[in-house]
Every structure is written in structure tokens, then in C-alpha cells.
Amino acid sequence: MTTETRSLYSQLPAIDRLLRDSSFLSLRDTYGHTRVVELLRQMLDEAREVIRGSQTLPAWCENWAQEVDARLTKEAQSALRPVINLTGTVLHTNLGRALQAEAAVEAVTKAMRSPVTLEYDLDDAGRGHRDRALAQLLCRITGAEDACIVNNNAAAVLLMLAATASGKEVVVSRGELVEIGGAFRIPDVMRQAGCTLHEVGTTNRTHANDYRQAVNENTALLMKVHTSNYSIQGFTKAIDEAELVALGKELDVPVVTDLGSGSLVDLSQYGLPKEPMPQELIAAGVSLVSFSGDKLLGGPQAGIIVGKKEMIARLQSHPLKRALRADKMTLAALEATLRLYLHPEALSKKLPTLRLLTRSAEVIQIQAQRLQAPLAAHYGAEFAVQVMPCLSQIGSGSLPVDRLPSAALTFTPHDGRGSHLESLAARWRELPVPVIGRIYDGRLWLDLRCLEDEQRFLEMLLK
């Protein structure tokens, strides 16, 4: 060991001496004595490695307390951090999909802070059923006879098939054998549920007679799957639920539908593309309809199944139901969200998902123009900051080919270097409240459709 190396090692402080320093008192109060000591030992090991490798001290050796504070502050950050979603995708799966209504947030808070009547009947002091209150609401909204709630729509499809078709065949059109995110495929789910897939028709055309010819003594269900995350256009043919139900009655085979997104209101009244609604399928005679809680419905992640009482009873009594059931926070949020649908006149104001989807391009354009000046003043030396028209998407596999006119702030590097865009995007992801946009066509785009808190946005970007 050289004299220089020995000198560097001698400059490393003892942990006891550091802990006696007044600057470490608040750190120990905040993070605990044990964690501070663990980190100091780790940092001393790191410093020794640097000395061995480069014959220098790490820069942070000038201020150990500051480095400890920085590391522990970062370590203490929640894994689920709030972000500002300016990607242009309203129901962004990676960012948690639907924002919850204030009523849902309040309901969850109450459910977390107090015992609740989750499975307790106040009338007779006996055991109740956790789905009962929501089932009544869902029946009122959809016209179904009964309802069942699980933790997501994938679970709903699995339970629906396992409870009603295990060991038997389920007939599905080849054009509806969907795959959603995370490699969730209808054929795979059927195998897990113990069903045999009997696919009929072709990718683009399926006729009623295809279903008729497929039915045999081992057929349990005729199934429709709403292709919510893709669209087949051109020379196509598909039969709707009403026609399939008529065929099912003739052949004595029930019809079930995986609706996916599941809007409970006609979106066309808000100028949005229409999606099939559970209540329409129930009216058409479908025996079971499954859909998501956290997509177009605008509530928490949940799988909802509505339909005929006898079929729902089979789901409720299946062993998988307990494994897939929703917890009290999910049920509280979902109940509060569903109650908003009882007052449709105020829905677009009280339900964040619908409020964001129905923002007009003109309003967003005015907002973008208002924000452009301060951002151009701050970033103008490196980037051209402009207001540009753009198209938002709904996301989460909902209405895949439809886009919503919107407006964006774009940042274009004066030197045209893409690395500057990557650097800017990375900088914004490191903010206390990260700002998430998207890089496209040589620009960093901030689609403002989902921006409601302008003050917080400017506070972040003008740091």
C-alpha cells in the first residue's frame, strides 16, 4: 500500500464520530439509528473500493450527512409515485388506468379507517355476502338478475368459464380469440378453466350456421368476446348477441360475453364513439356479461359479472370465487363509483375518466397557448416550444381505432439531436412529481388532455 493510499484511508471517518455530529441527529430521528448506521457502513465500503480503484476519495466524502440524506430520501420514496400523465393516453395501463372520483376516494378512506359491514347483516346480526350491496346497484343499472365482483376482468372470465363450462366445450368465433396486455389470451384462459375451445368461422367472417354446426352434446356455452383492443375492417361478418341468444335458445345453450372495457353509459351522447353496454346485452338475453371496473366505467380495478341469477349462483359457489374476490377497499370504491351512474346528468363532472375523455380540443388548445409562454421563456435556449394539434387515445384496449382531437406542447431541440430529447424526458421523470410525455417525430410531446392542475405542472417544469 502506497503512502498516498494510506493517507486516503486515514481520511475516512469513524461511524461513531459521524453519528455524534449534529447534522446526523435529524437523520437518525427521521430514518432511525439502525438504517443510518447500515448506510454509513455501506458508504464506507464504497469509499474504500473507490480508493483501491482510482486512488481518490468519492466527491460525497466532503459532506457525509448530505449524501446520507439524499440516499435515504430517495429510498423512502413510494414505489407508487404520483405522476403527471401527458402521454396522450387517458386510461394508461402502466400509469394505473382510471383516476378515482372524489366520492370513491372518500369511501375507500372510510373503509380503511374503520370496521365495515363487509360480510355482516345489520338486520339480523348474521353473516352477509360481500357482493350483495353492489349486486343490487348493478342490477338496477344494467337490468340483470344478479351480479358478482372479482378482482379484475381476467379473473371474471376465468371464473365464468370454470364455473359453467369446466370439462366441456365453449364455442367462440376465430375472429374473437383475443390477446390483451401481458399475454392474456382467451385460448389460454379456457385451458386454465378446464374448458375445450371450439373455434368457428374465419378471422374476418363468422356466420350463425358456424355456431350451429359446432354445437354438440358436450357444448356448455356460446361465447362472444368484444374485440376492444383491435378492429377487423373490410370484408367482415359477425353475428350480434341478440342473434346468438336466439340460436342458443333454440339449441338450449347459454350465451356469455366478455365485454372487456364495459361502458355503463352511451358514450355517443358525449361525442365519443359508442361502445356496447352491459345493459344492452342483458336486454338481448345474454346469460352472463363480464367487464372491467377501471376502464371506461372509471372506477377501481375490478371484474364485474352480471346476468341470470342461476348462473351467478354457480359462480358464487365455485371455489375460485374466494381466491378471486375483491377486498373491502375495491368494493367501497366501486360502490361509490356506481352510485354516480344513478345521476347521469352530473356524471361527466364527477367522474374523472369521463371528464377527461370529453374535454374539447378547443379548451385544451387555449390551455396550451396559456402555458406556452412561460415554458418557452424557460426552455427556449435549447428547445423550440410550440403548441401543436394532436390526437389522444382512450387506452387500456378501449376503442382502439378511435382518436380524440387534442393539443400538445412540443419541445424540439434547436440542434436536432435526439439525445437532447431523451435527456429532457429523463430530467422530467426525476422531478418530485414526474412529468411523463412521449417522444415522436423529433419532438417531445406533452398532450394536455389529462392536465387539470396547471399550477403543479408549472412548478415542476420551471424548477
From Swiss-Prot:
Its EC number is 2.9.1.1. It is an enzyme of class 2 (transferase). Pathway: Aminoacyl-tRNA biosynthesis; selenocysteinyl-tRNA(Sec) biosynthesis; selenocysteinyl-tRNA(Sec) from L-seryl-tRNA(Sec) (bacterial route): step 1/1. The keyword Cytoplasm applies. It catalyses: L-seryl-tRNA(Sec) + selenophosphate + H(+) = L-selenocysteinyl-tRNA(Sec) + phosphate. Its main location: cytoplasm. GO terms for biological process: conversion of seryl-tRNAsec to selenocys-tRNAsec; selenocysteine incorporation. Its cofactor is pyridoxal 5'-phosphate. The modification N6-(pyridoxal phosphate)lysine is found at K295. It is found in: Cytoplasm. NCBIfam families: selA. Converts seryl-tRNA(Sec) to selenocysteinyl-tRNA(Sec) required for selenoprotein biosynthesis. Belongs to the SelA family. Homodecamer; pentamer of dimers. Binds only one seryl-tRNA(Sec) per dimer. This is L-seryl-tRNA(Sec) selenium transferase.
